[in-house]
Amino acid sequence: MRILLSVMPFAGHVAPVTGVVAELRRRSHDVTVYSGGRYRERFAALGTAFHAWRDAADFDEHDIAATFPGTGRPGPLGLLANLEEIFIGTAPGQARDLSRLVDEVGAEVVVGDVMSYGAGMTAELTGIPWVTISVVPLSSPSVDLPPTGLGLHPARGRLGRLRDRMLWGAMAPMVGRLDRSFARARREVGLSGGAPFAVAGLSAATTILTGSPAIEYPRSDLPRGYTFVGRLPAAGQARSGGRAPHHGRPRVLVTQGTFNTDPGELIRPTLRALAAEDVDVLVTTGLRGVLDVGMPVPPNATVTDFLDYPATLPSLDAVVTNGGWGGTLEFLATGLPLVVAGGDLDKPEIAARVSWSGAGIDLRTGHPRASAVGRAVRRVLADPSFRAGAGRGAAARAPRGG
C-alpha cells in the first residue's frame, strides 16, 4: 500500500512516528513522509521518501517565535496562540502540500499526526481514507470530563459535575474562537462545515491512541474507531550519552524533555534539591551536545545530552520529568514512579493523569521550587504505592504491536 504520512516537526511527535514508519516498511508498504525540513535526515535513515513543508510555514521548534511571533506566552492565552498560529495556521499549507503529494506518489491513504490538521483536510479534498496517530494524550471533549488543559481529575458527585458545567461555560469563548479560526482555515482550501476543532484532528474511522486505559480517564462516549496501542518506540536514531556510575543507592533521572529545554525550570531545582540526598542523579538536557545546565553539577549527579533508555531505565528508581507524553509512557512501561512538573501545552494534563493513576506526584507547576521537588522525590522513593501504581499498568502501556 502507498501511504502518505504527515507529522508535525517536533521531536516528541517525530520520535514515535519513526517506529511506525520502520514497521510499515518492514511489512513492505511504500511510505512517504511529510514534515519539517530539519527531520529529512532522520527519516532518510529509515530508507523512506521524504518531502519537506513547502506551502506550510516551516519552523525551528527551538525558536518558534522567529516564525510565529505571537507564541511563547504562558497560560491559556499562550496555549490559544500556539494552537491558532502553529497548528491551525499551518493547516491550509499542509493540505495544499499533501494534496499535491497524493497525486505525485499515488497515495492510497493519508496518515496524520493528530496535530497535523492538514491531513484530515487532505482526505476531504482527495477522497482517500484518513488514519490518525495520536502522539499526545486524548484531549477530545467528553461528557464525563472537565475541559482539557486544566489538569483536573474527573469530577465526583453532584458538586463535581456542577464544577465541570461551570468550567465548560467559562471555556466557551475560547472554544468558539478556535472553531472560528479552524473554519477560516478550512475555507482557505475550499472546505466548508466540518467537525469542531476539538475533534478535527481525530479520524472517526481509525484513530490510533498512544497510551492505554490504565493512564487515560474513563469515557463512556469513547468512539468505536479509537484504539489504544501502548507506546510507540522510536527507530532510526540511537540515544547517545554517557552512563552514570552506580553506587548501590537509589538512582533518579531528571529530564526536561526535548521542547522548552530551559534547565532553570526543572533541572536546576532538582539538582539543588537532591545535592545532599543519598541518591545518584542522572540528568539529560534533551539537546544533542549540550551539557551546560547553568550551575555547578553536584558530586552525586551526572549530566549528559541523551541516555540509552532501554539500557538505563531498568536500573532507575524514580524519574523527575516535565511530563512529555512519549517519555512518560516509556517510564511507566518500565514501572518507574514519577514526579511530574507539567507547566504548559498538554503537560498539565499528563501530570494529572500520572497522579490519578497512582503512578506519581503532580507538582502542579512547570517551575517547582527545590524544596517541593525534594519532598516529592523522597516520597515516591519511600512509599511503595507509587511504584505499585506505575507497575499496575506497565504491561498495558508497553507496545502492543498490530
Give the positions of each predicted feature.
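N-terminal subdomain of nucleotide-sugar transferases
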Residues: 1-53
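A donor-sugar binding/catalytic signature common to diverse glycosyltransferases
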Residues: 21, 110, 305-353
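Conserved nucleotide-sugar phosphate-binding/catalytic loop shared by glycosyltransferases and other
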Residues: 34-79
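Conserved nucleotide-sugar donor-binding subdomain of glycosyltransferases
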Residues: 66-119, 161, 165-203
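Conserved nucleotide-sugar donor-interacting segment of glycosyltransferase catalytic cores
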Residues: 88-161, 214-216
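Donor-nucleotide binding loops and adjacent catalytic segments primarily
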Residues: 211-318
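C-terminal "capping" alpha-helix adjacent to the active site of nucleotide-linked donor transferases
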Residues: 368-385
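A short, well-ordered alpha-helix in the C-terminal region of glycosyltransferases
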Residues: 385-399
